[in-house]
Amino acid sequence: MKARIVFAIALLMLLGPAAAQQEVSLVGTWTGQRERSAKIEGYRGGLATLVITEQKGRAFKGYLSRTNKEGDEKEELWGAMTPGGRLIAGADDEGVYSFLLINQNTLDYCYVESGKGPRAVCARLVRKR
């Protein structure tokens, strides 16, 4: 009996990480307040909305909308993640995103552009249900 319990515990320990690495779905609409620092435009905040429209395995695509003084902007992005979603990265035509999945419905992101007008922005986003 004791051997069966030890075997069951060992089996759970081996299967636990595999179960944790099952596919993570980012599809949906995520919103939150962003804060940005830029060389030219300075500091700015506002609403950010990330919409992941499609996901195939660990790769995904979508767009990020944000509000500015000049009006709303919408930029397409493409991304991928490691098994289990521990490391998530993305890119658009100008910069690079890094993501951290806090829980099933909370996603932190930062975005960076380099060059003559560098900028960095970060936000905590919550998935709308």
Regions found by a protein language model. Give the residues of each.
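Bacterial N-terminal signal peptides that target proteins for export
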Residues: 1-7
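N-terminal signal peptide c-region/cleavage motif recognized by signal peptidases
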Residues: 15-17
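N-terminal helix-cap/turn-to-beta initiation motif at the start of protein domains
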Residues: 19-31, 53-57, 127-129
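Tryptophan-anchored aromatic micro-motifs
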Residues: 22-44, 109-113
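Short hydrophobic/aromatic-rich beta-strand segments that constitute the beta-sheet cores
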Residues: 32, 60-64, 86-91, 107-113
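N-terminal glycine/threonine-rich, aromatic-flanked beta-hairpin/loop signature
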Residues: 41-80
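Residue-level recognition of beta-strand termini and adjacent short loop/turns
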Residues: 56, 83, 103-105
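Short, exposed beta-strand-loop hairpins at the edges of beta-sheets
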Residues: 98-102, 107-119
